[in-house]
């Protein structure tokens, strides 16, 4: 991940949804949308954003289109992605769960039930949170608190991405053999 300014990482700042999907996109090697042939003309899939708040030319445009195409990210409703909204801890867990191909559980005891605020996890996030906890990608705050709806700090995102990458054998890595050393783009440094 890059810093927020030269020589400044800002670990306690929150990470936006756009910054997270950009980090994942860069870790995946910045793939171009696949071309599709229609009536003899080649067209790029998802040339038009499905979200009103993801305009063509925005620094996060390609990463969001990639994330949607790969099934990694979804909008927040009403045709919006909310790129500037802080990513929550449960959103982060679910996004990484989707990156892993949404594997099924192993039937073991639910790790999520050990946390005092397990009931605060949104129903759509339970499976992803359970998966991330089981693999120790996600850890609790202050002991036994998940804080699922709270914003994820840049430090938490960096730690979770590192643990996520550590869980993969090289052949099964969802990012292929990409060795991206700069997965997060600063808002002032737009993607081409």
Which residues fall in each region the model found?
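Feature responds to low-complexity, polar/acidic, surface-exposed segments characteristic
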Residues: 2-63, 70-90, 98-126, 139-152, ...
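Short amphipathic alpha-helical surface patches that serve as generic macromolecular interface elements
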Residues: 126-129, 154, 158
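IQ-motif-like calmodulin-binding regions
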Residues: 21, 93, 158
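Alpha-helix C-terminal capping/helix-coil junction sites
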Residues: 68-69, 133
């Amino acid at each position: 991940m890059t810093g927020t300014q030269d020589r400044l990482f800002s670990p306690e700042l929150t990470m936006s949804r756009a910054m997270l999907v950009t980090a994942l996109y860069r870790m995946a090697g910045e793939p171009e949308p696949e071309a599709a042939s229609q009536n003899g003309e080649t067209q790029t899939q998802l040339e038009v954003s499905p979200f009103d708040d993801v305009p063509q030319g925005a620094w996060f445009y390609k990463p969001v289109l990639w994330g949607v195409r790969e099934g990694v990210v979804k909008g927040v409703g009403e045709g919006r992605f909310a790129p500037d909204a802080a990513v929550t801890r449960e959103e982060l867990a679910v996004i990484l769960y989707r990156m892993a191909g949404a594997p099924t559980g192993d039937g073991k005891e639910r790790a999520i039930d050990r946390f005092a605020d397990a009931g605060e996890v949104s129903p759509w996030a339970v499976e992803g949170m359970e998966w991330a906890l089981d693999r120790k990608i996600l850890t609790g705050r202050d002991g036994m608190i998940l804080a699922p709806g709270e914003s994820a700090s840049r430090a938490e995102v960096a730690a979770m991405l590192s643990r996520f990458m550590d869980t993969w054998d090289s052949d099964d890595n969802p990012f292929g053999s990409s060795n991206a050393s700069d997965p997060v783009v600063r808002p002032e440094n737009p993607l081409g």
